[in-house]
Amino acid sequence: MLSFELSDEQKEIRDWVHDFAEREIRPVAHQYDESEEFPWDVVKKAAKVGLYSVDFIQQTYADETGLLPALVAEELTWGCAGIALAITGTQLPVAAIFGQGTPEQIATWIPACYGTADNPVLGAFAVTEANAGSDVSSMKTRAVKKNGDWHLSGQKVFITNGGIADVHVVVAAVDPELGTRGQASFVIGKGTKGLTQGKKEKKMGIRASHTAEIILDDVVVPSDQLLGGEEKLEAKLARARSGEHGRSSVALKTFETTRPVVGAQALGIARAAFEFARDYAKERIAFGKPIIENQAIAFKLADMATEIEAARMLVWRALWMGRHGGEFKMAEGSMAKLKCGEVAVKVTEDAIQILGG
């Protein structure tokens, strides 16, 4: 059964990440949000201290409760959502490689996503297309086998680290008639001919994170860079063609496991807004007393804190289930992400109202 008391190790790591966010992220958050430049300096500092590394990711996801990834994500995003995503964005392709790859692919490509402490690099996970966002079955990017290699052509949009990553994990349709069950994931290394960056997006938020199109123009991918290998893919396609019931697409499987952590990112945003509004309310004097002593303000802050705590429990429950029960029974990961996103919107809106008081 899940204990609500964090271990000493979990607390130590959480506090270490919080200190990094307070010391290295918050002071430059405004600068990178204004410039919309990728925060390489912060990523390099994270790599130097071991926060952006294969070893830390292994330690984080080896946590027996499953909670540590959320603790880390919440603290980083408390510092700045955009810079946090610059540091954590590589986890999505890593999750795909770890979940789908062979032992050899895992050993080769996960370290390649991070680089070294002296020379950190990035990974990207490319699924979304102009007409295939939530509707992954409408994906137009194709992978065709020719002379032993795979040839990929198509265009992806809204890709975190797209075009600047050293490793891109790209999902493409191998057999379009099978919908999501006819898709596969491919690892594409830096410098591969035919993969280029398209338009970089200008965003209303998380602007320190690089978001761009990637264009695949007959990109040749060796067969050993098909995640899971040829035999596994052929077996999956055969089951689908025979009408055998199967699970969702490779892309959706990856998203399913990472949704609670995205929820934790929203919690970091909400918590930062709540703390800022609470501290302001203690200092702002109106009618001879701090506005936090006004019941309307106090009630609003109490509701904000309650919503944050309740949403965190959904995240923790989903992560515990993922660690101990395998698959979610009732879309618990999506529930956690949904609730946390709604809480982030509500809390930040209420914080703005308090700052106007």
Identify the meaning behind each predicted range.
Residues 193-222, 226:
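Flexible, small-/acidic-enriched active-site or ligand-binding loops
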Residues 218-249:
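Long, acidic (Asp/Glu-rich), low-complexity accessory segments flanking structured domains
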Residues 84-104, 133:
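N-terminal glycine-rich flavin-associated loop
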Residues 118-128:
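A short, Trp-centered hydrophobic/proline-enriched beta-strand micro-motif
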Residues 50, 73-77, 188-193, 217-220:
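Short Ser/Thr-interspersed hydrophobic loop/turn segments at strand-loop and sheet-helix junctions
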Residues 1-79, 83, 100-104, 116, ...:
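Alpha-helical interface subdomain recognition
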Residues 149, 153-197:
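A short core secondary-structure module
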Residues 78-81, 132, 157-163, 206, ...:
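Glycine-rich phosphate/pyrophosphate-binding beta-alpha loops
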